A protein has these predicted regions:
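Sensor-1/coupling segment of RecA-like P-loop NTPase cores
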Residues: 67-88, 236
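Domain-level recognition of nuclease-like catalytic cores that cleave nucleotide substrates
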Residues: 125, 377-400
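Hydrophobic positions on the alpha1 helix immediately C-terminal to the Walker A/P-loop
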Residues: 12
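Active-site ExK catalytic segment of metal-dependent nucleases
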Residues: 24, 336-346
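Conserved lysine of the Walker
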Residues: 9
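Interdomain motor-coupling "hinge/lid" segment immediately C-terminal to the ATP-binding subdomain
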Residues: 86-205
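Accessory nucleic acid-recognition modules appended to NTPase machines
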Residues: 155, 159-334
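Conserved nucleotide-sensing/catalytic segment adjacent to the nucleotide-binding pocket
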Residues: 33-75
């Protein structure tokens, strides 16, 4: 199980283990490196926390499963990749399944009523779609949730100190003095923060790497070449805090070219907020930026829900100017299209129009199935089905 620090990996996995070892002290790490096979000893399921600090543990697990295969025998957790990836001699395919854990969605933090089910939409259960005015949820609530994030300790904290908890997470994110991983120790924290800030300024856009590099140079009055940027980006990706969204290519039979540039996203929007020093009040004063930050939070929740159904979230954009914020594509071929808006009749109408254009183009010029549903996902407002068949629902009613 991989994911960013502070998202609850160890706490969750402790619920499923019958014995465990934590590689969180220098003594434990040294012993595991000297005798990685011994780390496997213990009642199964055996939890090995922060396995990447003794990477040969992975090889020992794989070898053990080659000769003594059982389902659910080991649980490995990690908040970064190994310092030296060459020490992992096998991908684990066919032996070890990888699970990505993110901070909590609103459904998981019990801040979504869950009356709108993506599973039901995929199954065509239109009669289960609610009509709900949803009057007790405001933009101010969304701004707060966005800045707080889905970090379990922040979620549990009283509202008046939850933002401070998230701030403390950001302040400690790039403290590597005691880190045994040279890849992180050799990075300058201030440069990592610069890149994350530039990334945050381009949140929910398809900004090219060259654009982000130029932003770093201009905003901080310093030089940065593409090689240095790529090196620092690898470190940020290894910390699981960035999560770009790749493009959907439905193989359209026309001269239309599908754009392949990924959309820039974070594993949790609160990281972007803290990087830029953005508060709930700031968001309320800049609705254009608020919309981009909200799109990022919505993508976080859609990813969590869609992956639990056996699928992934992609984006669509072609050279004809047609763009869709999120395409929810299941492994069985079913898909649904989602436009993400803060709310308001004009925005909802624009989102519905985009969705219907995409549906028409796919049905006319692609071998893809027709979409299971079209959904305008809003920050606030009610849930209902429009006369044209497009569903409208706020994020605080959504669940898998």
């Amino acid at each position: 199980m991989a994911g960013p620090k502070f998202c609850g990996k160890t706490t969750t996995c402790m619920l499923y283990q019958k014995s465990f070892v934590k590689l969180n002290t220098q003594q434990a790490i040294s012993m595991a490196r000297m005798n990685p096979k011994a780390v496997l000893n213990g009642e199964k399921p055996r939890l090995i926390d922060e396995w990447q600090k003794a990477p040969d543990v992975w090889n020992q697990v794989k070898d053990d499963l080659d000769f003594n295969y059982e389902f659910g025998k080991y649980i490995l957790t990690g908040s970064s990749t190994p310092a030296d990836k060459t020490t992992v001699h096998h991908s684990g395919v066919g032996r070890i399944a990888s699970i990505k854990m993110r901070p909590m969605s609103l459904w998981e933090s019990q801040e979504s009523k869950g009356s709108v089910s993506l599973s039901a939409l995929f199954d065509g259960k239109e009669d289960e779609f609610p009509w709900d005015m949803n009057q007790d949820f405001s933009l101010e609530d969304v701004a707060y949730l966005l800045c707080r994030g889905g970090w379990p300790i922040s979620v549990r904290a009283p509202r008046d100190i939850a933002l401070e908890v998230t701030k403390n997470y950001w302040n400690g994110l790039f403290v590597f003095e005691d880190c045994e991983n040279e890849r992180f120790r050799n990075k300058k924290p201030e440069v990592l923060r610069m890149i994350v800030r530039s990334y945050a300024r381009h949140i929910s856009t398809e900004a090219a790497a060259s654009t982000i590099i130029a932003d770093v140079r201009q905003s901080n009055e310093r030089t940065m070449d593409a090689k240095t940027f790529a090196d620092y980006m690898e470190a940020l990706n290894d910390l699981y805090i960035l999560e770009d969204m790749r493009a959907w290519n439905p193989n359209i039979r026309s001269k239309t070219s599908i754009r392949s540039t990924p959309t820039r996203h974070f594993v949790d929007t609160s990281i972007a907020c803290r990087a830029l020093g953005v508060s709930p009040k700031d968001l309320m004063g800049d609705l254009e930026s608020f919309g981009l930050f909200f799109e990022d939070m919505a993508v976080r929740d859609l990813r969590i829900y869609t992956e639990s159904l056996g699928g992934e979230v992609l984006h669509y954009r072609d050279n004809a100017g047609l763009e869709c914020d999120a395409v929810l594509h299941l492994d069985d071929g079913r898909w649904g299209a989602v436009e993400i808006k803060l709310g308001g009749d004009d925005n909802i109408e624009a989102g519905a129009s985009t969705l219907k254009q995409l549906k028409s183009k796919i049905e006319e010029k692609s071998d893809e199935n027709a979409p299971s549903f079209l959904l305008v996902l809003t920050a606030v407002g009610g849930a209902y089905r429009r006369e044209d068949g497009v569903f409208v629902a706020p994020i605080n009613l959504l669940k898998p």
